């Protein structure tokens, strides 16, 4: 997976897909086992100033630092400091937001759209899930019948 952006937003109700993409992006951005340049924040109590301070810190023997923020509520409540920061953040910092609810009219959403990539992960219907399960089984070299 090629990483071309500094900021990613995974948003929507489909928690399994969000976790899969979060794990893939994390692996692509940092070498295996690099805990020195990885930070994880979760919940509405996340301090924007602390996140920005960490993003300003140079990575330790690596090209980038990854900061993952999950269900912070930053996209529902105004976060002007963070939206301004994203527009001028250093190349050594990467943000990965994982949110269930976002306000697409907000400044932070617009800043991420301008500087990064937004992936919406809506709940999948039965037919889509069935195709996905079949493809996963086939990748394992197994077979399953429709009636199973």
Predicted regions and their residues:
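Conserved beta/loop motifs at nucleotide-recognition and modification sites
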Residues: 1-148
